[in-house]
Regions:
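A surface-exposed, charged beta-strand/loop segment in the N-terminal or early-internal portion
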Residues: 40, 48-121
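N-terminal ordered "arm"
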Residues: 18-50
Length: 272
């Protein structure tokens, strides 16, 4: 059983991280900003540009502590990891399955089933808890469309059909998404999902949360010997962690709930 530890987030751009014995030291020039015992950590995420000492990098790779670098705006830059772990036969089978679309299809269906189920759950949760603040007819129509998409998934003959079903469900989901912004809606307008770059504060928060979560998933995949770049749903592309994105598909509902809960004017100022 894996013991859940803490993640150290270093948000000061000028910070430099080093190792003092068994302690991570965060410095800004001569000022010590913090000291954290290494054994309490399972990951370090740095938004700085000054870097990390080689000694700390080595300690992290030896102890399987994730070390991730993001830009000050939250864009993923790099992740440091140790030697590939796990059984090479596991990765070989992963590659074979991903290369055989018929074998990959059932896995892709399971991933999308989880995504659509959780999307439906989120809408039903808001409909149940906030009936006076929603257009129940529109939200109900969105839920019904997602249910219809769930019924169609088992019959999909290929990945193109899956993407079509997913697209219909996503359109229904995001058509009612603005209603889920119950707090400070005037400060957080939402006109649809946008990426690279996100075009509004809500999209910026979603993309940032997905970046952090995707990094965690990629590290977990590497720790058990799987290749994060070789997935079964997302197409393979250089530089893309396709398998991490596959697994991320099931999780946005929980992320969205937290993002909406923390939609405050001061958050918008931080994003801007």
């Amino acid at each position: 059983m894996k013991r859940l530890q803490n993640t150290l987030y270093v948000t000061t751009p000028e910070a430099y991280l080093s190792l003092d014995g068994e302690t991570v030291v965060v410095r800004n020039d001569d000022d010590v900003l913090g000291r954290v015992p290494l054994h309490n950590l399972e990951a370090i995420v740095s938004f700085g540009y000054r870097g990390v000492s080689p000694a700390l990098m080595r300690a992290c790779t030896e102890r399987n502590i994730g070390l991730c670098f993001l830009s000050r705006h939250g864009r993923f830059l790099a992740r440091v990891s140790g030697p590939v772990q796990g059984n090479v036969l596991l990765r070989t089978e992963q590659y074979r399955t991903a290369d055989d679309r018929k074998r990959a299809l059932p896995i892709a269906k399971m991933l999308l089933t989880g995504k659509l189920y959780n999307s439906r759950w989120l809408l039903e949760h808001f409909r149940r808890d906030h009936p006076q603040r929603l257009d129940l007819t529109a939200v109900g129509a969105g839920i019904d469309q997602i249910k219809s998409s769930l019924r169609l998934l088992p019959e999909a003959a290929d990945h193109d059909m899956l993407r079509g079903i997913e697209g219909s469900a996503a359109k229904a989901y995001f058509s009612v998404f603005p209603q889920l912004i119950l707090r400070n809606a005037q400060d957080f307008p939402f006109s649809g999902r946008s990426r690279r770059p996100p075009l509004d504060p809500v999209n910026a928060m979603l993309s940032f949360a997905y970046t952090l979560l995707g990094n965690e998933i990629a590290g977990a995949l590497e720790s058990v010997g799987l290749d994060p770049a070789v997935g079964f749903l997302h197409t393979l592309r250089p530089g893309r962690a396709s398998l991490a994105l596959d697994l991320l598909e099931e999780l946005p509902a929980g992320v969205v709930k937290r993002v909406l809960k923390n939609a405050r004017p001061e958050t918008r100022r931080l994003i801007n």
